[in-house]
């Protein structure tokens, strides 16, 4: 029987209920637990909201309650260099990035993991809803979280086998409701704290106002695919493929009462394309190209396989065929897909296992690129 007291686990604690219960469960299981709060954004921000200060107070209260030491570490430079610069570059290129995927890859499971090793960690743990399972050969497989509505493997799809070997996900087998019940029973200060949303580590800011501080918006024309001028857009970076709200055109043009959606972008001409109908033909595609292809365990350099995939968080899986060539892949859909968005992650699954994924570069319809950028 393993003596867990000799196994040191460093827990990434955000001041939320999930990471609080993660630390509690590991402590109850007898591990040598240390809590670490990551400060990744300057909280003396333009809105005067010091959320990190309050979050750290919650970390301290929880750590004191369960009896573990805790520290704070500053990764603001790493976050800026490895995540935020990427985030801005993607928007400049007319894409819609997913900073959470990059944040997990570069900060929570790289910068934080490296720091944890300096504290003598055997493992790191986070409050993500995912599971790890080691096979007889010692390979770690990442499985979906038991709570389908909270499963976060989509955001963890760029983790390497080396990172997974050092990672524990104590909440993976639990439902979110059970996590809150555990926190309440233990009297943790974060038991009723609402879940955070918004950009990874930056929080719930007015997105348009926030982004405009770093990227100057260029207004331009809003057009239909067949060339009708529909007015002015506020800046291409503020719109994503398939978006409905915020267009300001309602149903006033023509007799069709269907809602308007963003169906494409032309970065060189600064044109936003719009169309009516949720399944507008310009939104539909049957394949995509992806880069930064990465698998959570060893795979051949070139191979073809069938699996299911997600093209955005919380959407149902879709059947696909994947043709891998190094760090690039062509993904062919069994059924046409709506609003495949460059910059977002495509993530591959074999049943419960998350195999990895990549970043969407372009969607295609019958071999022709969609007018998405």
UniProtKB/Swiss-Prot annotation:
Residues 98-100 are annotated as: Interaction with target base in tRNA. GO terms for biological process: tRNA wobble position uridine thiolation. Its EC number is 2.8.1.13. One of its GO terms (cellular component) is cytoplasm. ATP binds at residues 12-19, 38, 127. Pfam families: tRNA_Me_trans (PF03054), tRNA_Me_trans_C (PF20258), tRNA_Me_trans_M (PF20259). CDD domains: MnmA_TRMU-like. InterPro entries: MnmA-like, MnmA-like_C, MnmA-like_central, MnmA-like_central_sf, Rossmann-like_a/b/a_fold. Signal peptide: none annotated. The record marks 128, 344 as: Interaction with tRNA. The keyword ATP-binding applies. It is found in: Cytoplasm. The active site is at 103 (nucleophile), 200 (cysteine persulfide intermediate). Residues 150-152, 312-313 are annotated as: Interaction with tRNA. Disulfide bonds join 103-200. PANTHER family: MITOCHONDRIAL TRNA-SPECIFIC 2-THIOURIDYLASE 1, TRNA 5-METHYLAMINOMETHYL-2-THIOURIDYLATE -METHYLTRANSFERASE. Belongs to the MnmA/TRMU family. Catalyzes the 2-thiolation of uridine at the wobble position (U34) of tRNA, leading to the formation of s(2)U34. HAMAP family: tRNA_thiouridyl_MnmA. This is tRNA-specific 2-thiouridylase MnmA. It comes from Streptococcus pyogenes serotype M1.
């Amino acid at each position: 029987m393993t003596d867990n007291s000799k196994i040191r686990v460093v827990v990434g604690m955000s001041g939320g209920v999930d990471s609080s219960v993660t630390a509690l469960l590991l402590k109850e299981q007898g591990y040598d637990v240390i809590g670490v709060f990551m400060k990744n954004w300057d909280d003396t921000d333009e809105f005067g909201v010091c959320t990190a200060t309050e979050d750290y107070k919650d970390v301290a209260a929880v750590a004191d309650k369960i009896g573990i030491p805790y520290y704070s570490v500053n990764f603001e430079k790493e976050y800026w260099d490895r995540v935020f610069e990427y985030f801005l570059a993607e928007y400049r290129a007319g894409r819609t990035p997913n900073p959470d995927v990059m944040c997990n890859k570069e900060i929570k499971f790289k910068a934080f993991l490296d720091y944890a090793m300096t504290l003598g960690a055997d493992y790191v743990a986070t409050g993500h809803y995912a599971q790890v399972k080691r096979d007889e050969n010692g390979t770690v497989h990442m499985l979906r979280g038991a709570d389908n509505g909270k499963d976060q493997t989509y955001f963890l799809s760029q983790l390497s086998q080396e990172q997974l070997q050092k990672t524990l996900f104590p909440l993976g087998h639990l439902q979110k409701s059970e996590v809150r019940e555990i926190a309440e029973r233990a009297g943790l200060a974060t038991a009723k704290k609402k879940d955070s949303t918004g950009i990874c580590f930056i929080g719930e800011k007015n997105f348009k106002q926030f982004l405009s501080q770093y990227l100057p918006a260029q207004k331009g024309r809003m057009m239909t695919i067949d060339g009708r001028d529909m007015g002015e857009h506020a800046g291409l970076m503020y719109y994503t493929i398939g978006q409905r709200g915020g267009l300001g055109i309602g149903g006033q043009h023509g007799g069709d009462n269907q809602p308007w959606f963003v169906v494409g972008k032309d970065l060189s001409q600064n044109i936003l394309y719009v169309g009516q109908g949720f399944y507008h033909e310009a939104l539909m595609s049957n394949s995509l190209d992806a880069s930064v292809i990465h698998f959570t365990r060893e795979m051949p350099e070139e191979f073809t396989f069938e699996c299911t995939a997600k093209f955005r968080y919380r959407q149902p899986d879709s059947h696909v065929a994947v043709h891998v060539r190094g760090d690039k892949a062509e993904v062919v859909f069994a059924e046409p897909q709506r609003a495949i968005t460059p910059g977002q992650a495509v993530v591959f699954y074999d049943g419960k296992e998350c195999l990895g994924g990549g970043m969407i570069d372009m969607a295609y319809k019958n071999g022709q690129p969609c007018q998405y950028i």
